[in-house]
Amino acid sequence: MTEMNMYWRTDRPKEGFYTTQLASHPQRPVRTFLPNDYQPRYPYPLVVLFHGHGGSEDQVLRLAPKLSRRNYICISLRGPREVGIRPDGRVGFAWDDVNHEDETEEYLMRAVEETRRTYHVHSERVFLAGVGEGAGVAYRIAFRMADRIAGMIALNGAVPLPNGRPLFNLRTMRGLKVFMGHGIANTDATFARARRDYRLLYAAGADVQLVPYRTTHELHPEMTRDMNQWIMRAIHANTDLLLGKR
């Protein structure tokens, strides 16, 4: 993400969940998980979470403390379309598949900017992570912003292929870090599809890892553990590169 003048808060708010209202998107709040023992002098990696079909920003942010209670600031975004009531009685949302990349990217950028105004976020350690349909959104944005993010995670999702063609530009894909966690019994997006996506991204030059899990479209408990380890490796690899280590 680009640098900007930041004046984040210097106190130490408690670990927990917070809500931010964006003036630019009043109907689409941003939920934040702040880690334990937040240190305002430390630039935290930021993980942006996109929920699955019928989910919500509250529901997907529950992954944050399972990912790590110390390592990251996490935010979650709300899809633009209501799709009924969830089993917990709350409204579920979805992401429109086509022709909304500009709007979603604008929403993301405003959410990241507001988070960076409030908390100390490392500008070069922003990761996108999506679940199910949200993984498709993360892919779309990552392909457009490959040079502005540190990497992306897709859990039980698929690379969007409108008209049978990928959305990415080969010139921007080289070196993009991608973690794919996928259930081998997933019938919504099959594991065979995940393998094809892996080969597609690998051939385009992405630094991609595909990890299978014994689950369906439901998230496996080990996914967040592996996500945490993958993000930390990605951060350390970039640090070593900057320091000239091999």
What are these regions (language model features)?
Residues 61, 105, 109, 139, ...:
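Short, surface-exposed alpha-helical segments at coil->helix boundaries
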Residues 157-233:
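The feature captures the conserved acid-bearing segment of alpha/beta-hydrolase catalytic domains
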Residues 65, 143-147, 196-199, 203:
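Short, well-ordered alpha-helices that flank and scaffold nucleotide-derived cofactor binding pockets
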